[in-house]
């Protein structure tokens, strides 16, 4: 897979996924991102003009908390559940 950069605003987080958010984990990852940058890309799948988060909710939310406009992603071919 090739690492790509996507606009955070173009990534949709499913409601079920949002329910699993742990703010403490987001804060820990944000601190790590400040020190080391984003270490692991998130996974997204294409859905028309937008992208849907497959994996990496806490990394995505940490990037948002830091005011980032883009994030490293891997575009995967995943099916809806």
Give the location of each predicted region.
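Short, charged/polar connector segments at secondary-structure boundaries
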Residues: 1-77, 81
């Amino acid at each position: 897979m090739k690492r790509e950069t996507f606009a955070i605003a173009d990534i949709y987080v499913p409601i079920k996924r949002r329910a699993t958010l742990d703010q403490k984990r987001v804060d820990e990852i944000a601190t790590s991102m400040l020190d080391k940058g984003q270490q692991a890309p998130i996974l997204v799948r294409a859905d028309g003009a937008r992208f849907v988060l497959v994996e990496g909710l806490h990394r995505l939310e940490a990037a948002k908390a830091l005011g980032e406009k883009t994030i490293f992603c891997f575009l995967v071919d995943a099916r809806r559940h």
